[in-house]
Each structure stands twice: as structure tokens, then as C-alpha cells.
Amino acid sequence: MNKKNKKLFLEALEKKFKGESPEEKKTTFYCFGGWKQSERKREFVEYAKKLAKKRGIPFYNPDIGVPLGQRKLMAYRISGTDAYVEGDDLHFVNNAAIQQMVDDIKRTVIVGMDTAHAVLEKRLGVEVTPETINEYMETINHALPGGAVVQEHMVEVHPGLVDDCYAKIFTGNDELADELDKRVLIDINKEFPEEQAEMLKKYIGNRTYQVNRVPTIVVRCCDGGTVSRWSAMQIGMSFISAYKLCAGEAAIADFSFAAKHADVIEMGTILPARRARGPNEPGGIPFGVFADIIQTSRVSDDPARISLEVIGAAATLYDQVWLGSYMSGGVGFTQYASATYTDDILDDFVYYGAEYVEDKYGFCGVKPSMEVVKDIATEVTLYGLEQYEEYPTLLEDHFGGSQRAAVVAAAAGCSTAFATGNSNAGINAWYLSQILHKEGHSRLGFYGYDLQDQCGASNSLSIRSDEGLVHELRGPNYPNYAMNVGHQPEYAGIAQAPHAARGDAFVVNPLIKVAFADNDLSFDFRWPRKEIARGALREFMPDGERTLIIPASK
């Protein structure tokens, strides 16, 4: 890595604060042009004036409320890229790539095919061969986007609206994979490095799974809970058609049960009534599952880079979309979340910790213990706090205490997980970092930010009945994790970190890891931060657009 002597964030700070040295202790205010210094806000005002006149209703006006632009309205460098973007373009409503990433997760369901094949062979006496599987896959790729296969006089969906919808298949059996239609095969041997491919095939075995991508427009109109139902209905119709079955016979009920329940793997679990969301919604996605969705680990062997990509993507899902909109509703959470994936600040802290660990312990080179947790968490936390003290522009970049606390603790947690190969040790280091940080600065963030951090030490190195679970299986709905921004994305990175250090093929679920090794997805899950940048630069083309069915101009 060899990044110890180079502050990764300095280049971004020098460009953001032109004319000011990052070390300068004094600065100026009210001389930057207010909101007009921002190209994007000037565009907002221009649009808003026209629309206010057209609507006859007051609209966006940046002169209302606190004066904007007292200091520089900073551009942000997307970490790990050369792209500088305006902060407004990182709000998920303004960023098509973030929207598509969330949609791609919500619209995905994995369904095992072995139960259905057993019903065909044992109950109905129908032979299942690679040829019949290929015919079924062709049928489901007609039916899943909204094509009719069993009944006449059924309305169908325009293919141009759902060109993002398809089904693919994968298996751990190389002989079967060789005979399957390559157009719809996720080839584990091709998509993963050899050692990872062997690990995945060992866990998957001879079983066969299909990955269904329901149309983006469906999860836009409905929700993630719709996905398994949409999928199951078309699976049933496709089996009936491909294997020439009678739609009314009793065995069809077994297909329905398998497709809707028994063989279904969803991305997220259903949430309790007070959070009131169905399966496949962001609040039900465990941290380890999200880490498996991100694909950097199959194209990079750098544990720090892998963990940072997970954190960056998770920041948009958990903090911006889930907590910032589903649970809170507003615009402010983007500012918290983007601290983890902009200006190479977290990158600098994580690489510092990774190098410290590699030199002293080696990756996965020491058993987890409180002594190890204390050593690494203290070293990385103090390093991070020293940077904020040495570079005032860094402090201004992360102007909120909760931003600083999240970034420093994330580096401490990931670094400890790199050393121990243990995510629970990593999350314990996160909590120790928060305590050290509060001791040094007297506060962390907004009132309630550190609620979970004050009680986290007791439930991260022990498994208790009401606060159990290894860290990879925890998620946004875990006790105490439900409503504090600046935690969940970093927790996902800490779930990934030990597995990245060990070179594991997956974190929690090999099926989910394989399902997203799919080059036909519009969002590139290998490099999510690059995709977020493309969205901010308006270079990303999303799926699910309605151009075909609306007037040329509204």
C-alpha cells in the first residue's frame, strides 16, 4: 500500500478550499458570493422561478431561511475517483445511480429450482434435463417482464418499459453449467478468481438457483415486498408452459409454495409494524448481506479498498435512503453519509490502520482480545483526531461531530477486523473509538448520536438473548441501531473487513454474492463509488424510464 507518508485527503482539500492552505488556522466569511457560488443552486433557482410562475404556487427560494454560502459551498471529490461533484448531486433524488442501486437490490429475488424439479420428476414423472431447463429459462424470460404464456386474452407489458427485467441461472455443478444456455448463465468460474470460485461452488454444491430481476418500474410503483410475488407468479406460469402441465392439478400448489416461500432467498427480511416495511426493503438488509451484494472483493485483493467500497455504497442505502427518507424524511442525512465516501478522508484513515495492522500483526494474524482491540482502536483513533487538529480545512469539511466520529470509528473498526479476522472485535473497536473520541473532544455528535455507542461494548464481545448475533447478521433493525445516522454504513464495512483480509469469497451468503456477479445490471456493483460519481455527473443511465408512454414534453 505504501500510503503512510502521503495524506490522501490533501489534494481534495487544496482543490475545495482554493487559496487557503489546509494548515491555515484563520479564514474569512461572507466573501464567496453566497448561494450563487454554486452552479447547481443557480440552476435550481432558474428552474424554480419558471415553475413557480407556471404553477402559481411558491417554490424553491434559497434566500428563505439561513443564508447559504457564508463559507465556500464545497465541491466533493468522490473517494477513490478523480471526480469532483456538488453536494446537491449526492442526494438520492438528484442521483440516478443511487436510485438504481437501491432499485436493483429491491427488485432481486433468488429462487431455488431443486424443489420444483423434484416435484416434476417424483410426482409427475417428467424428466428434467439441461435441455428442459434451458427451455424453462427461455419461457421465464418471456413471462417475467410481463408476457402471457398460459391464458389467452391476457394483457401484457410493453417490452420497452421493462428491458431491465430478466432471469438468470447458476449452479455449483460445472458439468451442468457447461450445458446451460450461456446467455442466462452466471458463470462462477468466469466471474470469480479461481480460489473464490472453488469456495463458492463448494458451498452451493449441485444445487441450482435462478436469479429474477423484476422490472425497476414495479418496485417504483409498489415495493420490495412485491418482488417475490411477481417472481412466483411468473415462475408458476413458466413451469406449466415449459413442461406442458395442467394448470389445475394438485402438484401446481407445490410449485407455488416453493416459488413463494420454501425456496425463496430475499435480500431483506420483513420489518416490525412500527417500521412497517415488507421484505426486500433497505431496513431489512443485514450488514453481511449488503457486503455480499457489493462485488469489489472479486476484482480486488486490497482489504481496505474492498471495505471502503462497501461503506460508500452502504452510506447511500442505509443513511441516505433508509434513515434519511424512509425513517426520517428530509435532506440532511446526505451530508452525514457522504462524509464516508468523499474527499479520501476515510480512505486515508483506513489505509493508515491497515498499514499499522499489517506491519504489527499481519492480516488475520492475531486472535481477538481486548488488548488487541485497545491497541489498534487507540492508534487509529488518535491518528484521525490528530488530522482534524492539524488541518482546519479537514475539520470544516467534516463540520459535524457525528461525521468525524463515524469516520474515525469506522477506520478503527475495520483495522481491528483486518488484524483479528473477527467482525465482533471490529465493532468493539468502533465502540472503544467512540469513547476515546468523546474523552478527547467532550462530545461526539448531535444529541442521541452516540446512544448505541454508549452500550455497544457490552453486546459486541458477548452474545445475549435480546442483543445477540454475530456482527455480519445484524442489520438496521438490530436493537439500538434503528435511528442513529452515521453508524449503519460503517457497520457494513466492518462486517466486510475480516473477510476481505482473509480473502473469503463471501461474507454471509454465497448465493447473494453470485447473484450480483451479473454484468447485465446497469449499476456496476464492483465499483459503487465510481457509479455514485457517474450519477452525480449525470452520466448514469437508469432503468425503468417511462418515455415510451408519455408525451414528448410535459
UniProtKB/Swiss-Prot annotation:
Which EC class heads this enzyme's classification?
transferase
Among SUPFAM superfamilies, the record links this protein to: Methyl-coenzyme M reductase alpha and beta chain C-terminal domain, Methyl-coenzyme M reductase subunits
Q: For coenzyme M, which residues are the binding ones? A: 336, 447
Q: Tell me the Gene Ontology biological-process terms attached to this UniProt entry.
A: methanogenesis
List the transmembrane segments. Answer: none
- The keyword Signal belongs to this UniProt entry's keyword annotation: no
Binding residues for coenzyme B, per the UniProt record?
A: 229, 260-261, 274
* Record flagged with keyword Hydrolase: no
Q: Which UniProt keywords apply?
A: Metal-binding, Methanogenesis, Methylation, Nickel, Transferase
Q: Which residues bind coenzyme F430?
A: 151
Cofactor annotation comment: Binds 2 coenzyme F430 non-covalently per MCR complex. Coenzyme F430 is a yellow nickel porphinoid. Methyl-coenzyme-M reductase is activated when the enzyme-bound coenzyme F430 is reduced to the Ni(I) oxidation state.
Instruction: Tell me its EC number(s), please.
Output: 2.8.4.1
Q: Which cofactor does it need?
A: coenzyme F430
The reaction(s) catalysed by this protein are: coenzyme B + methyl-coenzyme M = methane + coenzyme M-coenzyme B heterodisulfide
* Record pathway: One-carbon metabolism; methyl-coenzyme M reduction; methane from methyl-coenzyme M: step 1/1
Q: Which GO terms of the molecular function aspect are on file?
A: coenzyme-B sulfoethylthiotransferase activity; metal ion binding
Q: Which family does it belong to?
A: Belongs to the methyl-coenzyme M reductase alpha subunit family.
Database matches in NCBIfam families: met_CoM_red_alp
Q: How does it assemble?
A: MCR is a hexamer of two alpha, two beta, and two gamma chains, forming a dimer of heterotrimers.
Biological function: Component of the methyl-coenzyme M reductase (MCR) I that catalyzes the reductive cleavage of methyl-coenzyme M (CoM-S-CH3 or 2-(methylthio)ethanesulfonate) using coenzyme B (CoB or 7-mercaptoheptanoylthreonine phosphate) as reductant which results in the production of methane and the mixed heterodisulfide of CoB and CoM (CoM-S-S-CoB). This is the final step in methanogenesis.
What protein am I looking at? Methyl-coenzyme M reductase II subunit alpha
Which species does this protein come from?
Methanothermus fervidus (strain ATCC 43054 / DSM 2088 / JCM 10308 / V24 S)
The root-end lineage is: Archaea, Methanobacteriati, Methanobacteriota, Methanomada group, Methanobacteria
